[in-house]
């Protein structure tokens, strides 16, 4: 049996169900819409690049075919269109953040091959970050570039404690992550 683990706008991930961990024990061929696209021996495999809002059939020898449809997207833009350089030296933080801020719901931000040096990026709901093969987000080594999020703050109207972040279930101060999302959903990376 083939299980669909994920189907985005331009990629999909599948699990080959069997009695072994990680590897299937033998190589198998994967066909996408009848065309052989890969050979693998891993229980989990991904297919990309795919086209948004398109019907596909995946076949693996000895298993029932699986039909799925990729999701639609509002637009797909390159981070380089916002001035990101991707050379590992230039600070691309503002360029990446501007691109994220400009994405509409359902938008996809594409990172071509390169190394994008950055401080934390604030994400938002209903977007996709799509990194090409050999595209790297290189986090700054300067800890002062990572804001500290207090574990709790006080609501100025009600006086109640508001949790702003937790570490292993505890509301304690912590540095913001390289990719950060608060009160957000449906973010695909």
PLM feature spans:
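Extracellular/periplasmic carbohydrate-active domains that bind, remodel
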Residues: 1-189
